[in-house]
A protein has these predicted regions:
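N-terminal Sec-dependent export signals
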Residues: 1-27
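Extracytoplasmic beta-rich ectodomain segments of secreted or membrane-anchored proteins
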Residues: 19-104
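Short small/polar-residue motifs
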Residues: 45-50, 71-78, 138-143, 158-167
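Short, exposed beta-strand-loop hairpins at the edges of beta-sheets
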Residues: 154-174, 179-181
């Protein structure tokens, strides 16, 4: 009998090519993505941060800028891993001047990333008891507004064997929404 081959983390889940699917989907919502820029030098940590709970190194990163229809910057979508494939994806959106001033953009970008990179299964699974991605974001925004902490973090673990981390950071009237998807 032969043993089943275990697949490496790079062979399961999303790939760097999924950026094209995200770009196409976001364009239907009038959100536009630049072509990815490959980063392999020592500035990689700025775009694809290292996480202590990731065993695998990140030595390859692709970053894209996202803008509205008028080319106003909204944020970035980045993927990191090795040349074999990504192990993390990250979206960061600046919603300044207020926490909810770009709520539609945050919803569209984060829902699109989860649907394409994780699964189109949120409504069926309702992870964390949230019936939708936007319900998760709404509760996080409420908790962030009530909090005295600069950063609120909410995690959903194990959706299609991936971990989702939502961070809302507020400093000096600047609000950053970050979604991290880890394989």
């Amino acid at each position: 009998t032969s043993q089943p081959q275990s697949k490496s983390i790079y062979e399961v889940g999303f790939t760097f090519n999924d950026v094209d699917k995200i770009k196409k989907s976001l364009s239907t919502q009038k959100i536009f993505m630049s072509s990815p820029i490959e980063i392999t030098d020592n500035s990689i940590g700025k775009y694809c941060p290292y996480f202590t709970d990731i065993q695998n190194p990140i030595d390859h990163c692709a970053t894209t800028a996202i803008t509205d229809i008028h080319r106003n910057p909204l944020g970035n979508i980045n993927m990191g891993g090795t040349t074999d494939g990504p192990i993390m994806a990250l979206a960061i959106i600046d919603s300044s001047p207020s926490l909810d001033s770009k709520q539609d953009v945050v919803n569209h970008v984060f829902q699109t990333m989860i649907k394409i990179l994780v699964c189109d299964c949120w409504e069926d699974r309702q992870p964390g008891g949230f019936e939708s991605v936007s319900a998760w974001l709404d509760v996080a925004a409420e908790k962030s507004a009530e909090s005295t902490q600069n950063t609120l973090t909410s995690k959903i673990n194990g959706l299609e064997n991936m971990n989702l981390i939502l961070k809302i950071t507020s400093t000096n009237e600047k609000y950053l929404w970050t979604l991290i998807i880890l394989k």
